[in-house]
């Protein structure tokens, strides 16, 4: 199960009734934060999402409405008692920006691992943290994160998250591979085990892969020909909808954003299950007034709202 909360749905500037766009995902008690504009940690308190268990922070681009909340959040996480490493993923230039923020944060009780302009990452989800791993034929990860270069006025990344479902234990396979019963439970947890100088791996006892959960996120971009393939068959596609009406197309083109209808067209082409719009212009008072524009193209389109929660379950 993946729990997804929209911490904010605004673009450009924080408004009294709308925080800046940010999303937090919770999987097995560990969290991933997508973007961190001014006021994000306030919304986290309002929604009770917690700070200490944030392992990965994904930044789409370096405009203030997506990153100005980061210094304060990093400080708060430090005050929460966290000592485990945090990964910050972002576009080209993210390291320089974080280094600047750290001038105001001379001491953090945890390490920051800044991953700049990367395209494909794999993580294991452990009880106390998520951990970056290198895959081989013997070990499978719990989570893959892929990025895509978008079309905005500054370097910008889209994100696609694949949550892998744990494979079922296969007793016949374990016996065939002569795996001692005392290590079965650890191998089922995808751990590597040594016993009597012999190494055992999870592939020796686990069955075939099962369908997981895919969530994709693109914000602050014009439509590109690569997006539909990148988001293909996502269970949930979170996309910017800065402008509700096609009458604002000239603004969308000039400012390198999207209209509701353009986002819906990407969702349709990508054959996603559900589209959730976010990053609304301050000029939009009620995004739901414009949702018909998206549904004309892709029926399962929804205008997100601050604090909205979506639960994505594994399917058999």
Curated annotation (Swiss-Prot):
Its EC number is 3.1.26.11. Zinc phosphodiesterase, which displays some tRNA 3'-processing endonuclease activity. Probably involved in tRNA maturation, by removing a 3'-trailer from precursor tRNA. InterPro entries: Metallo-B-lactamas, RibonucZ/Hydroxyglut_hydro, RNase_Z/BN. Keywords: Endonuclease, Hydrolase, Metal-binding, Nuclease, tRNA processing, Zinc. It is an enzyme of class 3 (hydrolase). Belongs to the RNase Z family. PANTHER family: ZINC PHOSPHODIESTERASE ELAC PROTEIN 1 (PTHR46018:SF2). Homodimer. Zn(2+) 1 binds at residues 61, 63, 152, 220. NCBIfam families: PRK00055.1-3, RNase_Z. The active site is at 65 (proton acceptor). GO terms for molecular function: 3'-tRNA processing endoribonuclease activity; zinc ion binding. This is Ribonuclease Z. Zn(2+) 2 binds at residues 65-66, 220, 279. Binds 2 Zn(2+) ions. Its cofactor is Zn(2+).
């Amino acid at each position: 199960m993946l729990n997804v909360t929209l911490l904010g749905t605004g673009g450009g500037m924080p408004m009294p009734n709308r925080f800046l766009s940010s999303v937090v995902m919770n999987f097995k008690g560990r969290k991933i934060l997508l973007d961190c504009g001014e006021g994000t940690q306030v919304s986290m308190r309002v929604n009770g999402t917690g700070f200490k268990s944030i392992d990965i922070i994904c930044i789409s681009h370096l405009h203030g409405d997506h990153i100005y909340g980061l210094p304060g959040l990093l400080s708060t996480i430090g005050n929460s008692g966290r000592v485990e490493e945090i990964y910050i993923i972002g576009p080209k230039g993210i390291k320089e920006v974080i280094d600047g923020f750290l001038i105001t944060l001379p001491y953090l009780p945890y390490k920051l691992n800044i991953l700049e302009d990367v395209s494909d990452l794999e993580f294991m989800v452990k009880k106390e943290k998520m951990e970056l791993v290198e895959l081989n034929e013997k070990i499978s990860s719990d989570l893959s994160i892929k990025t895509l270069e978008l079309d905005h006025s500054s370097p910008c990344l889209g994100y696609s998250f694949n949550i892998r479902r744990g494979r079922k234990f296969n007793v016949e396979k374990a016996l065939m591979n002569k795996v001692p019963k005392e290590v079965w439970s650890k191998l089922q947890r995808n751990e590597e085990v040594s016993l009597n100088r012999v190494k055992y791996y999870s592939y020796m006892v686990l069955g075939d892969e099962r369908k997981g959960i895919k969530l994709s996120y693109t914000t602050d971009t014009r439509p590109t020909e690569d997006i539909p393939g990148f988001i293909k068959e996502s269970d949930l596609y979170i996309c910017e909808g800065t402008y509700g009406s096609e009458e604002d197309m000239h603004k969308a083109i000039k400012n390198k954003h999207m209209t509701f209808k353009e986002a819906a067209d990407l969702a349709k082409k990508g054959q996603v299950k559900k589209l959730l719009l976010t990053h609304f212009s301050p000029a939009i008072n009620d995004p739901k007034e414009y949702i018909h524009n998206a549904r004309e193209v892709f029926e399962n389109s929804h205008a997100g709202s601050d604090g909205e929660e979506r639960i994505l379950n594994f399917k058999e």
